[in-house]
């Protein structure tokens, strides 16, 4: 099976290329308190061992921002800082990390975004515009009445166009909803109006089982349509499981080849060997 991928601009997050003809990369996010450097680094090493290609950490306060250099020094894969509400944290993180994620729905006035652009430009690192159905701009909620796919796409397009108007194109975009249909529609709408590389995911997908199913359906469909340049499977579980599921989704679509592809009988009364153990 050959999937014709959408043509997107290529950016680099550290040594990982995203978009263009680069393979779809798999990323995850630490579930530790970032201020707990020992626990965070330990989890990062587990993710690296599982093959995770980009790792994001939450930066909710100054204390978390201050320990980013220690965390970065202990890593072999690119580090992404996740910022909400306070653009000053993005300015501090930009001095250390390989990419900064901001949410246009809660970062505040445009002058704050301009300061973030200046900070990431100084180190030639990209920005992720992370739109989320739970934190859309008020005027879009009033316009559409709810966080609809159209509202998500418009939020992302508005942010991208505003950034492009000031000459900033070193970015990737995500449009996340917890409903699979809404997420698919939002990504589809955006993908047909922009060549920005896309980070795909289903937010708040659920526990290990339900989240894996929802993500496999949502991300699998998008990828089968050629949409998606990097992905995260969001699970209320061990982040290592996110990496495993992510690679399995890509393997099932023949977009990545990693590890052994196990083809196993589902078992029935005719089985005379331990299929589960062998698989």
Segments predicted by a language model, with ranges:
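Structural preference for beta-strand elements that scaffold enzyme active sites
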Residues: 8-10, 23-27, 54-56, 76-82, ...
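Catalytic alpha/beta core domains of metabolic enzymes, predominantly
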Residues: 132-135, 140-279
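Glycine-rich phosphate-binding active-site loops on the catalytic face of alpha/beta enzymes
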Residues: 51-53, 96-112, 202, 225-239
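Alpha-helix-loop-beta-strand connector modules within alpha/beta enzyme cores
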Residues: 61-83, 115-127, 187-198
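Glycine-rich, proline-tolerant flexible connector loops at the mouths of alpha/beta enzymes
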Residues: 29-37, 48-75, 104-108, 171-180
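Active-site mouth loops of central-metabolism enzymes
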Residues: 13, 20-39, 58-60, 77-85, ...
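Hydrophobic or amphipathic alpha-helical targeting/insertion segments
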Residues: 77, 87-128
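N-terminal amphipathic alpha-helix/helix-capping segment at the start of soluble metabolic enzymes
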Residues: 1-28, 121, 278
